[in-house]
């Protein structure tokens, strides 16, 4: 009580035990919250808005600003937000930009790869699951299969190996398990150690001269850093701007 707390935004999302502890601490103490990516959507700001006294609780926020889709019965899906002008004003009240100069400059390079255009058009036209040999049933399955076809192309795998030949230590971010299977099956070389961080395994960062660290976005985009390499490969992109920025920041530190 009557102390000063500095929080890492990574833990202050959602509505779990960390957020509940955050609420208790902020009631009787002064605090600041550090974040490189404040939020993808308005619901990411709910814990901070509540801690500042703008809303009583999450239900109060939802009642004032959230409209759920009527066509999604399995789980609640947000259709749109109401009174976003107020949300913008509240966000401007709590965000403080911290300008600083980095000794390093990030270099992002787009690598162009190919994909099977015939199969791609076939999926679009026939709505047919080529892997399970059955009709596509939902829009989400349709998009997933198009993405799978593109991400599994051999040209993408070849580009990964080309980069690894010139960069002895790389972090590779991916989304899906089938991408992990592809990455684990690549021939990086006999002297290259391969480790992974995902929902199945959390292996430590390799210590050798040549390695590839395979990281699933949701598991390892936040909360750690690496100063042993200057190269990240995004095998596939994540839908979230916040996740992509956080993943990029694993090697973009003040001491790198």
Model segments located where?
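Conserved RecA-like P-loop NTPase helicase motor core
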Residues: 193-256
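Conserved ATPase-coupling elements of RecA-like P-loop NTPase cores
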Residues: 10-22
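A short beta-strand-to-loop transition that corresponds to the Sensor-1 phosphate-sensing loop
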Residues: 9, 34-38, 174-176, 215-218
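Inter-Walker segment of RecA-like/P-loop motor cores
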Residues: 1
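Conserved P-loop NTPase motor "coupling/switch" region that bridges the ATPase
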Residues: 4, 21-102, 256
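Hydrophobic residues in beta-strands of the RecA-like P-loop NTPase core, especially within AAA+ ATPase
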Residues: 7-8, 248
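Conserved helicase/translocase motor-coupling segment
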Residues: 105-190, 199
């Amino acid at each position: 009580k009557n102390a000063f707390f500095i929080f890492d935004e990574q833990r202050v999302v959602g509505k779990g035990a960390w957020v509940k502890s955050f609420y208790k601490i902020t009631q009787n103490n002064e605090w600041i919250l550090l974040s490189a990516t404040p939020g993808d959507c308005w619901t990411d700001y709910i814990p901070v808005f509540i801690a500042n006294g703008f809303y009583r609780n999450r239900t109060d926020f939802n009642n004032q600003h959230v409209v759920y889709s009527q066509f999604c019965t399995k789980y609640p899906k947000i259709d749109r937000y109401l009174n976003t002008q107020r949300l913008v004003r509240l966000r401007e009240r709590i965000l403080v930009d911290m300008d600083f100069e980095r000794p390093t400059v990030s270099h992002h390079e787009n690598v162009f790869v190919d994909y099977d255009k015939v199969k791609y058009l076939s999926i679009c036209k026939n709505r047919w699951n080529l892997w399970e040999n059955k009709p596509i049933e939902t829009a989400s399955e349709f998009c997933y299969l198009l993405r799978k076809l593109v991400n599994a192309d051999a040209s993408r795998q070849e580009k990964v190996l080309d980069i690894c030949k010139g960069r002895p230590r790389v972090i590779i971010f991916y989304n899906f398990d089938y991408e992990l299977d592809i990455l684990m099956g690549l021939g990086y070389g006999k002297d290259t150690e391969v480790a992974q961080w995902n929902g199945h395994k959390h292996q430590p960062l390799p210590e050798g001269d040549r390695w590839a660290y395979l990281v699933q976005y949701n598991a390892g985009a936040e909360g750690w850093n690496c100063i042993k390499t200057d190269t990240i490969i995004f095998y596939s992109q994540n839908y979230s701007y916040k996740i992509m920025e956080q993943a990029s920041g694993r090697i973009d530190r003040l001491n790198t």
